[in-house]
Regions:
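Class I SAM-dependent methyltransferase Rossmann-like catalytic core
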Residues: 1-28
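SAM cofactor-binding core of SAM-dependent methyltransferases
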Residues: 19-101
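Short, conserved active-site loop motifs that form the nucleotide-linked donor/cofactor pocket
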Residues: 108-109
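Conserved SAM/SAH-binding loop
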Residues: 113-117
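A short acidic, Gly/Pro-enriched loop at the edge of an enzyme's catalytic core
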Residues: 121-129
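Switch II (G3) loop of P-loop NTPases
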Residues: 134
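A short, conserved alpha-helix within the catalytic core of class I
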Residues: 137-142
Length: 151
């Protein structure tokens, strides 16, 4: 995978942050798999995948793929490309899968659930947790608490 090519992937992560994230994933994936909370279209997942792959490690991505508050219709970051007209809702999962397949990131394992639901059943040790999910205070606080409890 060519990291520079990830600039083309839809997402909000600047290249320099993605490059740093990839280095952290490489460093901490020698202790266990990586978990990403909040996936959107997979840009950060791909940076994590690149780093974790150097240690033959998995990246678990947790996202309901219905978008955060700011991705909803009439909001600042609404995007028609991820809007499903059949269900009248945001659905970033098809574009996420397309991006993961395009870059052949076979070490990425999607968990299509809310972080709250996933946290209730997760009990495996992780080398690193990257949290960039919902930005509402309630979501951030709960997700951080559960990530800390299970690490």
């Amino acid at each position: 995978m060519n990291l520079e090519a990830l600039e083309e992937v839809k997402g909000f992560m600047p290249y320099h942050e993605g490059e740093a994230l990839s280095k952290w994933a490489e460093e901490f994936s020698n202790k266990g798999p990586i978990m990403e909370i909040g996936t959107y279209c997979g840009k950060s997942s791909l940076f994590l995948s690149y780093g974790a792959n150097k240690n033959n490690q998995l990246v678990f991505t947790v996202d309901h793929h219905n978008g955060s508050e700011e991705h909803q219709i009439d909001e600042e970051y609404f995007d028609n490309e991820i809007y499903d007209t059949e269900t009248n809702s945001v659905n970033s999962f098809p574009l996420f899968v397309k991006n993961i397949n395009r870059f052949r990131a076979s070490n990425v394992v999607p968990i299509v659930r809310s972080s709250v639901d996933a946290a209730k059943t997760w009990n495996a040790y992780l080398g690193m947790v990257f949290i960039d999910g919902g930005h509402a205070l309630e979501t951030v606080s709960y997700t951080h608490l559960r990530a800390h409890e299970t690490s």
